UniProtKB/Swiss-Prot annotation:
The mature peptide does not contain cysteine residues. Acts as a neurotoxin by inhibiting an ion channel. GO terms for molecular function: ion channel regulator activity; toxin activity. Residues 1-21 form the signal peptide. Residues 22-32 form a propeptide. Coiled coil: none annotated. GO terms for cellular component: extracellular region. Keywords: Ion channel impairing toxin, Neurotoxin, Secreted, Signal, Toxin. The lineage of its organism: Eukaryota, Metazoa, Spiralia, Lophotrochozoa, Mollusca. Expressed by the venom duct. This is Turripeptide OL179.
Length: 70
């Protein structure tokens, strides 16, 4: 159980620079990553999920056919 949480946290740490870099780009060159990054952040904000449910949702999104990479 603990190993899964570590893997999820590592995946989140790897995705954060991509999301933040794309959000800082006003030209729209990284449109796809920007779209997925903001949609996930908005989803967390609107649902007001706690940390464990955020990790579960992130694991779900990453596990379903690589949603973030398409």
């Amino acid at each position: 159980m603990m190993a899964k949480q570590v893997v999820v946290l590592l995946a989140l740490l790897l995705l954060l620079p991509i999301v933040t870099a794309s959000m800082g780009d006003a030209s729209g060159r990284t449109g796809r990553i920007y779209m997925y990054g903001t949609s996930i952040q908005d989803l967390f904000r609107y649902l007001q999920l706690d940390y464990q449910r955020n990790v579960f949702l992130l694991r779900f999104l990453l596990g379903r056919g690589g949603l973030l990479l398409h």
